[in-house]
Amino acid sequence: MKVYEGGRSLDGAVVTVDGELLDPRFDIRRFSRMGFEWTYEGDGPRQLALALLADHLGDAQRALALTEDFMRDVVAELDNAWRLTSADVEAALRPLPPSPLPRGEGEH
């Protein structure tokens, strides 16, 4: 089971997965130039939601499709220092609607 942890230091917000820095997944989409944030709704929390979901799901498109709801329901509610397990992430995904295509996908 993976363990995701976030906290703040003099260097800013730091997020790890199993003790290693979490990849922000700018290759999928760049929401924030400033990196990760949490405790509110916005671009930094959106980047964290995408990174957590991409790591957990192993599916970039599904992660992108679920980012907004996961950011609002989970990331915006995290404390300054937090810990989530892969089981916590999975439990948070259960009540979310099935992942639609990201905006702009499938439109012709």
Language-model segments: residues:
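Long, low-hydrophobicity ectodomains and other hydrophilic envelope-associated domains
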Residues: M1-K2
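Short, compact, well-ordered microdomains
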Residues: G58-L96
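Amphipathic alpha-helical packing elements
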Residues: G6-G7, D11-D69
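A cross-taxon signal for low-complexity, glycine/charged-rich
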Residues: R103-H108
